[in-house]
Amino acid sequence: MKTQVQGSYGLRVKSPGGIIKREAECKNVITDLGMNRLGNTYWKAAEYIRVGTGTTAADPGDQQLVNQIAATNNRLGLATTDNSGAPLYRSRVTFTWQFALGAVVGNIAEIGVGWAGTGATLLTRSRILDISGLPTTISVLAGAILG
């Protein structure tokens, strides 16, 4: 049986009042560690979102962010859709996390999800990409919330 896993990130920078100031979306790389984790304890593979300033391309061999500056397990919601059925049997899971006000300030260049807030525990990693798919940063100013 052939099985595939893929994912993407959507980032929003919001004012404390909830006004969206910036959005970005990018596909991620499922790490080798992440694939092993999915095979053993998949329900605990995506507990934390982590952001950093690292600028190297994501690779399946990545185990942690290049230069992590913040992490949170403040999950606001979990939305799932049922299995799509034959012939593809697709399922979708959407997690929503939000950092506390002031927890992330600066230019974010990388993002990852893992089962812990630090260390070699990454399920996925990605660079932040612009609309053309090129590496960029997303600025989070003091007084803004990353979610």
Language-model segments: residues:
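Small cysteine-rich, disulfide-bonded extracellular modules of the LU/uPAR three-finger superfamily
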Residues: 1-109, 115-147
